Amino acid sequence: MECFKRLTTVFFTVKLVQYLLVYFAPGQFDTSTPLFLEKYQPLQPEKWYHKLLSWDSVYFVKNGLQAVTHTNAYGYVSLPEYEHEWMFSPFVWSQTLKTAGGATLRNWAAPIDTLLVRATLLNLVLHYVSVWLLYALTLRTFPKNRELAYKTSLLFILSSAAGFLLAPYSEPLSFAFSFLGMLLRMLAVEHNVYGGITLAWYNWLPYTLSGICFSVAAANRPNCVLLGVYYIYDVLKLVRQRNWVRAVLFPCIAGSMMLGIFAYMHYYLPSVVFCPERESWCKHSLPWIHIPYKSFYSFVQGYYWRNGFLNYWTWNNVPNFLFALPNLVILWYSTVYFSYQYPLESIRPLVYITRALLLIITFFAHVQIINRISSFIPLHLWYLSDRMIKTTGEAKGDDRLVYLYVNWLILWIPLQTVLFACFLPPA
């Protein structure tokens, strides 16, 4: 009960301070927000919370409004107005915002305000629920270590995503389902002293539900497709143990479900909508099914944002690498720590997932986004918490790194919150 009170108090105190920073922040540098508001709710007065419509949140809210105000195009989903808006969760998060906004939203004089406020409240709830999902996941991973669970949840509240979690970004939905999926899988899988795994038949349901959770997370944020590494790991373990039936009925079913939903969202549906007109994407297709071998998400990222191998490695992007450096370092150190100094077979797949994310973000993407999209991975939070517990006396080596990272967070969270409210980089 004491832990519940402390974490709840910290959570709402941090959020209150952040919203006060947004309130007192000066006007926005960019004109995207006033132009967006002028188009979709003209003659409405400017409000302080319009500052939350910064960067990608403009597109998330627009896609949500599109889902409410337009007729469903394919029976159950409304398509984005422009192709670059497919980047911003046009189905899962947009449909969630549609539900939050309500069917009568199109008749309101200020639909953006209504959607913005409700989506922001929804993200607050998702973040708060995720704090406790992570607490439960930590206790399952490190049994009876309540201090570690408490510190991990505390660090998750003080996330480097900072201001992004105040606005209608799609990250909270993904990390909520990611943590829930990890917890369900951890409840279903037993690890033995020989490095093998055991999957009891009565655990088939929670294991399969983990696949549904990961599918929702990946459909919402494509980087979460890396969670499929859990099922690859389990298949290899079960095949090595010659447990063929369970290999098929547990990880193969859960993983196939996840892969199928991801393929439908990012390959099949865009090919139906854009091919053959979008020749630059459609012409590179698989010969036997006539679907492009490159996901539409990757194509749009490359075409509009110049994502690709080393494309971001230019001198003018050095500041963005500096913004990302603390998380790049701490994520890498966490994989080393849980591979050699504190090896745990149960979190080995998460080590692989973290390393894969680091490689993708460092060499193929806009590197500064690591500060928010790494929020679905708890590995570095466990590393930080464990070292904070074990540190006695003067911090040295890894402990010095942890000390510097926590102090960076204390500086970064208010700074990034104000920058976000002013529509200033980093995005």
Curated annotation (Swiss-Prot):
EC id: 2.4.1.-
Domain of life: Eukaryota
Keyword Chaperone: no
EC top class, as a word: transferase
InterPro entries tied to this protein: PIG-V/Gpi18
Transmembrane segments: 7-27, 119-139, 164-184, 197-217, 247-267, 318-338, 350-370, 404-424
Chief place where the protein resides: endoplasmic reticulum
Keyword Ribosomal protein: no
Membrane topology summary: Multi-pass membrane protein
GO BP field: GPI anchor biosynthetic process
Gene Ontology terms: cellular component: endoplasmic reticulum membrane; glycosylphosphatidylinositol-mannosyltransferase II complex; mannosyltransferase complex
Annotated GO MF terms: alpha-1,6-mannosyltransferase activity; glycolipid mannosyltransferase activity; mannosyltransferase activity
Subcellular location: Endoplasmic reticulum membrane
Pfam families: Mannosyl_trans2 (PF04188)
Involved pathway(s): Glycolipid biosynthesis; glycosylphosphatidylinositol-anchor biosynthesis
Signal sequence residues: none
Keywords linked to the UniProt accession: Endoplasmic reticulum, Glycosyltransferase, GPI-anchor biosynthesis, Membrane, Transferase, Transmembrane, Transmembrane helix
The protein's role, per its UniProt record: Mannosyltransferase involved in glycosylphosphatidylinositol-anchor biosynthesis. Transfers the second mannose to the glycosylphosphatidylinositol during GPI precursor assembly.
Similarity section: Belongs to the PIGV family.
Protein name: GPI mannosyltransferase 2
Taxonomic path: Eukaryota, Fungi, Dikarya, Ascomycota, Saccharomycotina
